[in-house]
Structure formats: C-alpha cells, structure tokens
C-alpha cells in the first residue's frame, strides 16, 4: 500500500500488479479461457480516517510503530522482508539504504497516510470453459505474507504455499509433497519473471 504499486495510474491495477502469476497459474492449470467473471474489492481500511490514534505520517516518527502490524520498520529493517525493493548505492550498506528510505522515501510512509488508490482486498470469481470454477482472493489482512493455493478436484486436491505443494488423492490415500524451499528466496519470483 505504500510502495511502487500504491497508485494504479503509476503502476497497474493491483490485481494485475500483484496477482498476474496467480492468474497465469490458474489459466495453465485449467487449460481453459475465462467465460465469465465477477470481482469485488475496495480500498476500505488503509485510509486516513482509519489510522489508529497517535499514528505518525512515517513509521520511524510514529509513537505506536512498535505495536502496528503494518510497521515499515519491522517489515524492512527488522524482518528484512522485500529488501530487493531497495537499490543499494555504491559505498552504502543495506542498513543505511533501508533507514534512508524509511526516513524519506515512499516505503517509510504510514499505510494509513499514503496517497494510495488501489484496493486493499479483492475477490475474483471466474467461470472457465468446461464449467470449471475458480476463485482468487487477494488479501492484505493476513499474518501469512505469502501465497496460499488450494485446488479442489473431483479425484483429489492440491494445496500449497510458496515453499511446498502437496497433492492428495481421495481414493487410495496417495499423498506427495513437493518442496521448493531451495529456490523460494531467489529474486524475480525464483526466476519466473524472467521467462
């Protein structure tokens, strides 16, 4: 909500910007084109009127930052999530670069006090050729900062996250787990963006 995808006219609609791989996967998995779709979502929560009392304009200057689940300091500086967003200039360290961005750049702004105009949640329902139905939910409100996939089939189901994929068959109890942990940390969605 605070980074490069915060405004549709400067980037893309958020579903395209953040879920294009998910939609590609669904199209590949079904092998079908979408016949009909409906979509609901809005920018309901990350607005100034919903900011907690005491929230500052920037996370580093915020009196309630340590209790905020959306703290940019915690996300980027402490946990080191999404640090590929920061271009480290020659002669600077990653810590220096992150702190400077948190002090002056778009990534240090309070999520409630940004100039964002994209939805903070969206639900997409699609009917594919062959009467296959698909739903996709893009949520900002989750403790899990990764994709989850659950595919229900007539003979089994597939569920996974960005590290593992588990395939279970209803008859016979056959279950297989595929582990992708060794590539999950690679940049550009483990190289998928480059192909």
Residue positions per predicted region:
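Generic signature of intrinsically disordered, low-complexity segments enriched in small/polar residues
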Residues: 8, 73, 79-80, 85, ...
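Sequence-level detector for tyrosine residue identity
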Residues: 76-77, 107, 112, 141, ...
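C-terminal helical cap and adjacent loop that interface with cofactors, partners, or active-site loops
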Residues: 118-195
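Active-site rim elements
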Residues: 10-16, 109-113, 183-190
């Amino acid at each position: 909500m605070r980074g490069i995808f915060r405004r549709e006219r400067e980037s893309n609609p958020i579903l395209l910007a953040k879920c294009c791989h998910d939609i590609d996967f669904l199209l590949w998995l079904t092998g079908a084109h979408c016949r009909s779709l409906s979509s609901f979502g809005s920018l309901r929560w990350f607005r100034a009127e919903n900011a907690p009392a005491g929230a500052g304009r920037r996370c580093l200057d915020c009196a309630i930052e340590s209790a905020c689940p959306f703290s940019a300091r915690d996300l980027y500086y402490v946990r080191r999530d999404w640090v590929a967003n920061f271009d480290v200039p020659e002669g600077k360290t990653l810590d220096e670069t992150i702190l400077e961005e948190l002090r002056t750049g778009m990534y240090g702004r309070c999520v409630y006090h940004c100039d964002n105009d994209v939805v903070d949640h969206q639900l997409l329902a699609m009917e594919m050729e062959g009467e296959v139905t698909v739903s996709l939910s893009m949520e900002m409100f989750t403790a899990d900062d990764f994709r989850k996939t659950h595919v229900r089939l007539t003979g089994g189901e597939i569920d996974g996250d960005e590290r593992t994929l588990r395939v279970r068959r209803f008859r016979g109890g056959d279950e297989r787990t595929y582990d992708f942990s060794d590539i999950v940390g690679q940049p550009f969605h483990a190289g998928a963006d480059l192909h």
